[in-house]
Amino acid sequence: MIINHNMSAINANRVLGBTNADITKDL
């Protein structure tokens, strides 16, 4: 359960990172 939770957090961070990269690229 803890491992799955950590993996979800990592995936969420990747999505946020990709979104930030897209915003920065547009700027």
Swiss-Prot record:
The keyword Plastid does not apply. Keywords: Bacterial flagellum, Periplasm. Signal peptide: none annotated. GO terms for cellular component: periplasmic flagellum. Transmembrane segments: none annotated. Coiled coil: none annotated. It is found in: Periplasmic flagellum; Periplasm. Its main location: periplasm. Component of the core of the flagella. Belongs to the bacterial flagellin family. The flagellum consists of an outer layer composed of repeating units of FlaA around a core that contains one or all of five antigenically related polypeptides. This is Flagellar filament 31.5 kDa core protein.
